[in-house]
């Protein structure tokens, strides 16, 4: 650095206010001299060295485009001082490095430096967030410190960001790399000055027990609860929190809904002109009590029902935000809420305080087996509940845990070859859109077992208008927003290869579009998928459509698909097994209902 050039590093402010504009000349590592500016929502910089930015030197290589570059405060997770050291000249391609080495070496200088840490979206995968660091150098230490103070002040104003987190790590999740995943991302939390209390689970149900027993006073000292594991581990933590706190009326039992059902034998969609049996909302819509105090059938920590509220674990309107760092076998929840199955991306969503709300499904088991007495038992699911094929796969997979995630492919093939079907009865509350959709189904002349109907699909994305249309969960009480005044229940009975209820699309590596491509994260609906008994080739075609991007897995005659807020299930076999977010759930009779926007989550939704 030559003497007499200190004026190039002067900083000047357009406003005395901390929120006002601020500009100054700095050297950006590997770029060159830039004019750095701070405005109300972020940083921007513009190259000042024409020899670097115009691309007229070093054989015409453009080192830095002559345009402004920026990063928003909402995308910055840390600013740190990195002491006195080298600020490098612009990066060069290998072909030209030798020719320009001597010239660029002269421009490499030592100065005081600070680094702005943020992220950049991958050009090919916008949902994938890559760590990015921008190091700025200046000859004056006080100037660097002043800029750091200003930037940190701006970050403090990002009020949604967590400062203290309770982290559960499942060391054996997925391929058994839960601890390694946390070790990788924990460095980002440390750099962002986020305090973490880490609990590495030692047994099944460990996280559930901690969440069920922790006092709300202690829970409120944390800004969020983080799971490092898979969907099943997230389910365990969620149930530990909700079962001891959430008090809402239960959904109708199968016998209750039968009294108000419009029965049509094996057809669950009424034809145009049919008489519609409507019921009053107070009778059959379970989530609209007359008052906050009018609740029924509460449950204890173990899921059984009682009528006594636990005073040590009331359900707070200020619910903790949950987060999930993927380390599981499928990681469908992360795929649906961030768009990427990437621990670093999920960690950044958490640190930067991204927020959305997820629907949750309350599942009530009335009977375990056909000979059991009626005894309500409650669980919650954040993504999926499945019976038949799905239940058989999760049940059989327990024998092959030593295989890791590959066990699902192996067991799935075995169950497919067995081609078992189950006799059952399903009743569901019909959504308003079902009435018009029912009259539109027509048969394809070329493929008699496929439907020709193609409806416009509105996919769930970041800042989704459908999910943000209204908040489903009333933060002032444990009630939901008003629902339609009248509801209609329909019944379908027969033999099924599988029955699935999806809360979200459930995208994963085996089903890139998910079970229902246009399912939303917080629209207040369950997506009921009934696969009726059919030949093995037809079922294989359905699974093939499910496994490819742009497929139509629901467009078959033997597939019934309904959007609903609640449904009931009764098996005609001796026993039945359900898959609840990847966990085994035995239920001969069950009911389920959606709770809109119940779960606050550190995520922003997929970008594309």
From Swiss-Prot:
InterPro entries: ATP-NAD_kinase_N, Diacylglycerol_kinase_cat_dom, Lipid_Phosphate_FormReg, NAD/diacylglycerol_kinase_sf
Enzyme class of the recorded protein, top EC level: transferase
Keyword Disulfide bond: no
Binding residues for ATP: 170-174, 201, 230-236, 329
GO annotation, cellular component aspect: membrane
Residues the record marks as active site: 231
UniProt keyword list: ATP-binding, Calcium, Kinase, Metal-binding, Nucleotide-binding, Transferase
pH dependence: Optimum pH is 8.2 (at 30 degrees Celsius).
Phenotype caused by lack of the gene: Enhanced apoptotic-like cell death late in development.
Cofactor (UniProt): Ca(2+)
GO molecular function, one term: calcium ion binding
Residues annotated as transmembrane: none
Ranges where the record places region Disordered: 254-280
Protein name: Ceramide kinase
Originating organism: Arabidopsis thaliana (Mouse-ear cress)
Gene coding for it: CERK
